[in-house]
Amino acid sequence: MTDHDHFSRAGAGRESPLAPGLDPARTALVLIDLMERIVALPLAPHPGPEVLDTSLGLARAFRAAGAPVVAVRVQRPGVPEQPAGSGLVAAVGQAADAVVVKHTVGAFHDTCLHDELRQRGVTTLVVAGIATNMGVESTARAAADLDYRLVFAEDAMSALTAAEHDASVRLDFPRFGTVVRSADVYFAGT
């Protein structure tokens, strides 16, 4: 068993921790910083292209269920020209129902994210993206403070090191929500 095999797997003889499934009318997928230059970084434990593919798979499932997908990207204030590759990966932007531009590590501070989610009636967030211990965790902490139910798709996120990723996934995220593999994210009735 590898370090990442401890997460529940639907269809592996165990019930998903999300049973009986998520409500698509109350759930949104929030994708953090899936930008060209960030996805291209050397990441661990999941390579950037793998995180991207897994995140896009989640986005397809959310869109098929009628649940919103929100893509978040960072744009640092006071920097007249952002570094090359600062846009979202094109497929992420195309999959998103809304794009939120943040100016800090987390996606809620001084953005329209909370208002966007509340207008849609969202109470549960499935969070994915890069980096696990930075943008994902900062966003999750703020979401918890705002009383969102949180689900972390562990294989749809990564960090600069496996140790940083694992510290968030094993120590911090379970205090705020449920950590699962993306295969365990499903909607009620499916």
Descriptions of predicted regions:
Residues 30-34:
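N-terminal nucleotide-binding beta1-loop-alpha1 segment
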Residues 1-28, 57-60, 64, 77-190:
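Active-site-adjacent betaalpha module
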Residues 36-41:
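Short acidic, Gly/Ser-rich segments with clustered Asp/Glu that frequently serve as metal-coordination loops
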Residues 25, 43-71:
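A short alpha/beta connector and helix-capping loop motif
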